[in-house]
Amino acid sequence: MSAQASPIAATSGARRALDRTTWILVPAAPFVLVLVIWMLATTYLQPSKETLPPVADVLSSIKELALSGQLATNVIASLYRLLLGSILGILTGLIGGVIVGLNRKLAESLNPIVVFFNAISGIVWLPLMITWLGIGTALAVFLIWNTVFFIVFQNAALGVQLVPEVYEQGVRALGGSRWETMRSVILPGALPYILTGVRTGLGFGWRALIAAELVGAATGLGTMIFDAAEYHRSDIIVAGCLIIGVIAIAMDRWLLLPIERRTVRRWGLVADAEKER
């Protein structure tokens, strides 16, 4: 038995190792291509450093920012605002979306006002919000909440509405309560839409955060970029953009994506073949 199981186990282990390698290398390929083009452009086209800084200058700036402590200070400040605004947006959007999704008449009544406010970009609120909230964390949190809320709200409402009613009727026919129907049918069915809304909302939350910090904040990655622009330090500007992108990718691939996969699998919303991968 062990002689037969060993080759199978070895094959399975090799496949998992290959999948992990592919999971890392394939998404990295476009970044490598951009890096190569960037290096070739600065080497052969030789634009001014203010127009396109060399890769070495950007890396040197990141090192200097890290050693001086500025990088950690700005990253922590931005992450604090992002997480606070996103958590508020996710919670309120999820609760509101589920409630509206469960009541089609309520959904029809609220749809016009949701479309109205969703069409107004968070940036448009800046002049008024600066008057109300001042410049600082409260302003950034509001803009992030305003961005994340509508994305999660609409995805949650849509996910709930698309759950087939026959599933709900089946649970109720077996004597299930309203809460049991919600827990075993509605939430699992809407879960893929909700999680997609969360991931998308966080991505747009970064944009709202940087916009708020550009307007005015003592610390933060947006503030760092804006200050660098005043001194024509394009190397720090590019460094700030790279840092934002790297943090966003890390959050998505090592936090949000694993949570999404585990949660969806827990509710049995993937095929058995996918579970084995």
Where are the regions a protein language model picked out?
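Transmembrane-helix boundary motif in ABC transporter permease subunits
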Residues: 84-114
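Hydrophobic alpha-helical transmembrane segments of polytopic membrane proteins
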Residues: 221-259
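Transmembrane alpha-helices
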Residues: 142, 146, 178-212, 235, ...
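Short cytoplasmic-facing helical segments at TM-TM junctions of multi-pass membrane proteins
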Residues: 112, 155-197, 221
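Periplasmic/extracellular loop-to-transmembrane helix junction in inner-membrane transport proteins
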Residues: 13-20, 44-88
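Transmembrane alpha-helical segments of polytopic membrane transport and secretion proteins
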Residues: 1-32, 253-277
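Short hydrophobic, aromatic-rich alpha-helical segments embedded in or entering the lipid bilayer
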Residues: 53-63, 67, 206, 216-229
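Generic hydrophobic transmembrane alpha-helix motif, especially the helices
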Residues: 115-151, 158-162
